[in-house]
Amino acid sequence: PRARVELSVKPSEAVSSTIFGGIVGGFLLGIPFLNLLLVWGVLGGFLTVHLLKMRVDKFGNGYIKNSDALLFGGLSGVVSAFIATLFNVVYAVLLKDWFVQAGEFLVSSGMDSALADVTIKLCVTDLSLSLPFILLKLIAMIILFAVLGAVGGALSSEFSKR
C-alpha cells in the first residue's frame, strides 16, 4: 500500500469545487418533501471535498486535511442554503395551489392542521411569502447546512485516507 500524503489546499483552488458541491446540495435540498432527507447536505459537502481532492492530488495518494475538509464542506453547505431558499420561494410562487392541496390532504389523512402547516413550511416555505419567515428559515438553513456540509467533507477526507 502507498503512503497517504496530507494535501494542502489554497482557497483559490477550492472555489469551483465548493460552488459545484453547494449547487448540487442546494438543488437536492430545494426539492419539496425530498428536502426533509437532510442527507443531501452531507452529500454536497462530500462531493465538494472529493472534487477538491481530484483537483489537487497529482499522484492519487493524498487526502484533504481535516480542517480544509470541514471548512470547504461547510462553505458548500452555505451555498446550498441560498440555492435551496431560492428554489423554495420559486416553488411557493409557482406551485402554491398544489401545496395548499397537499396540506389539505395531510389534514384529511388525520394529521393535526398545525403540524400539516409546519410540514409545508419545512418542505417549501411560508406560502404567504412572509419575508421575516423566509429570512429566519434562511439563517437556520445556513447553520444547519453548513454543519451537514462539514460532516460530508470530513467523511470524504476520512474515506480518502483508506
Residue spans for each PLM region:
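Juxtamembrane/disordered regions of integral membrane proteins
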Residues: P1-R162
